[in-house]
Amino acid sequence: MKFRTLLIIFSLVFLLEIVSASEPQCGRDAGGALCHGNLCCSHWGFCGTTAIYCDVDQGCQSQCWSSPPPPSPPPPPPSPPPPSPPPPSPPPPSPPPPSPPPPSPPPPSPPPPSPPPPGGPERPDHRCGRALGNPPCNPGRCCSIHNWCGSTAAYCRGSSCQYQCWNSLLSALISNGNNAISKIISKSVFDEMFKHMKDCPSKGFYSYDAFIIATTSFPHFGTTGDITTRKRELAAFFAQTSLATTGQRFDSQDLYVWGYCHINETTNGNDNDYCTSAHWPCPSGKKYNSRGAVQLTHNYNYGLAGEALGLDLINNPDLVATDPVISFKTAIWFWMAQHDNKLSCHDILINANSGYVIGNIIKNSGYQNGLITNTISTMRGIGYYKRYCDMLGVSYGDNLDSWYDQTHFSEVARM
């Protein structure tokens, strides 16, 4: 029963409207246009409300955050009392001086600093850098040369980064043996799995390093259960994302070596902006069509993924297609997250022996008709899965083919 689940995952993911960037909106490159709704115009000509848009130190062009007013000067000291008139001669005896007032109580202690954000030691204002004593950013985030913590290439890559950078993070993960994923799959195996990714349209956008760095944001991905379960989860994830990004070279003798060939698979000739949820208002000119390792689609998926990852993907959807780490993070997020209150792909896979009735999960998922009509795509997903299991040295699991044997005896036919 365990790996009937895997087939469901491939079908669910394929039928999910799985979840390409625009001209500047404001500022000097947009003819001096201002942002609507009092939003700030960033150095790069986009509208937003966070420090990267509004802080003049970050290059804000218009409608920026105002500098705080200087503190009010202290009130002037009271005027000294007028001098006492000279006493008559002979002066009367002076009265005894009044008792000195009691000492003022000490000032109250300053309040304690605000606690750091949940999950890490990062400052509440997300500032970092040498001028502040090199405070750490949260795990998976980097300190940029502009003294802000963040998780994109603008913060983490090369000369843009001060510390906790991608290169140093990757070296530490592998050399210290602290990352369970790198123990299961090496760079040489990954490159052999996706042997054509450098001569496909993606031109090497996807990489082992980007994948390993992305996994650090998901501590339960590929690390749950015994080694067999963990290898199968990686094989299933790679099969899912390979099917989404396949080069579709079905005239080839080897159909299953063409994963990670596309970044924006559905953008050519597609005018749909996929702004389908009013809960996530779409800025003018932004499109939410398929991007990245899981071909993320629809504004609500960009919104939810960005919320989970601490990124503004509604205003910057092209990060999924231009930053390989973010591309993999959105794919792993999609794998790990629940959708429509259904079990996540991760949960279904690791609980396949926990008594779940897989057929009921499929029937309740809302994708039954698509599942039946896309048997061929699911079979291709199985082909990818088998190849990756072989390369990771793990068995496929039981009952793998009984769901899609294309006969009236299959589980799908009985649904």
Curated annotation (Swiss-Prot):
Post-translational modification: Glycosylated.
High-level lineage: Eukaryota, Viridiplantae, Streptophyta, Embryophyta, Tracheophyta
Role: Chitin-binding protein which slows larval growth when consumed by the lepidopteran species S.ricini and M.brassica, but not when consumed by the mulberry specialist B.mori. Lacks chitinase activity.
Name of the protein this chain belongs to: Mulatexin
One term under GO cellular component: extracellular region
Pfam family for this entry, one: Glyco_hydro_19
Residues making up the signal peptide according to the UniProt record: 1-21
Chain residue ranges for the region called Disordered: 65-127
Subcellular location, record wording: Secreted
GO biological process: cell wall macromolecule catabolic process; defense response to fungus; defense response to insect
Tagged with keyword Amino-acid biosynthesis: no
Single GO MF annotation: chitin binding
InterPro entries in the record: Chitin-bd_1, Chitin-binding_1_CS, Endochitinase-like_sf, Glyco_hydro_19_cat, Lysozyme-like_dom_sf
Glycan attachment residues as annotated in the record: N264
Note: On the 2D-gel the determined MW of this protein is: 56 kDa.
Every Chitin-binding type-1 domain range: 23-66, 125-167
S-S bonds: C26-C41, C35-C47, C40-C54, C60-C64, C128-C143, C137-C149, C142-C156, C161-C165
UniProt keywords, alphabetically: Chitin-binding, Disulfide bond, Glycoprotein, Plant defense, Repeat, Secreted, Signal
Biased composition (Pro residues): 67-121
Membrane-spanning intervals of the chain: none
